[in-house]
Amino acid sequence: GHIICIMPEGVKMRLLEIKGLPVSVLIDFVHRHGGILGPAHPCGEKYLSFTNTGRFYKSPELIKRFDFIEAFNACESAESNEGARKLAEKYKKPGIGGSDAHRPDCIGTGYTILPERVTCETELIALIRSKAAIEAGGVLYGKTAKDKMGPAHKILTYSFWFYNKGGALLKKRKRTLKGKIENPATPIDPIEIPYLHNIKKQK
């Protein structure tokens, strides 16, 4: 699925630009470098949205390790956004909104209202980690390729799957090499300790 990552200003990691990073590794990597992350349109199309991936079916508890959830996406359906909102409420995660704009007239159709002024990525990261009251919303765009194609958009969904899988395979060697440099084995990030403690209690 698509994942939104927010890193502190000045932190640019090449590994984040390479396709095919397993989500559990991505979560560790982003947290280790001081960032936050969450699933985009989590209840949307198969393969492109976290709750409709094989990884979620195998390990649904991974949702607890995200810092926020995109609760509104202007290019998704009302049903998809409602599912995302309920997901954020269920796991007590801050919900953000976005336009997911691929065309100029879609920009600004989704929004996130913060309870205080934010001037940089570090301040935004701190605010979301504090689980501050954040409001997300907007208006549905309704003019995406998916909307225009109707039922035939499933062809587009599967083509994206092949594109992403192919890209991941082609980038495997580069991902491994960059991983050794940017993501070496290190002690567990303190932010993960509550999650790991809960998993231990469940066992």
Could you say what each language-model-derived stretch is?
Residues 1-14, 24-28, 45-203:
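Charged catalytic cores and adjacent phosphate/nucleic-acid-binding surfaces used
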Residues 14-16, 38:
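Short secondary-structure capping/junction motifs at helix and strand boundaries
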Residues 17-21:
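Glycine-rich anion/phosphate-binding loops
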Residues 34-35, 92:
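Residue-level detector of structured alpha->beta connecting loops
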Residues 35-48:
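Aromatic-lined carbohydrate-recognition surfaces of secreted/lumenal glycan-active proteins
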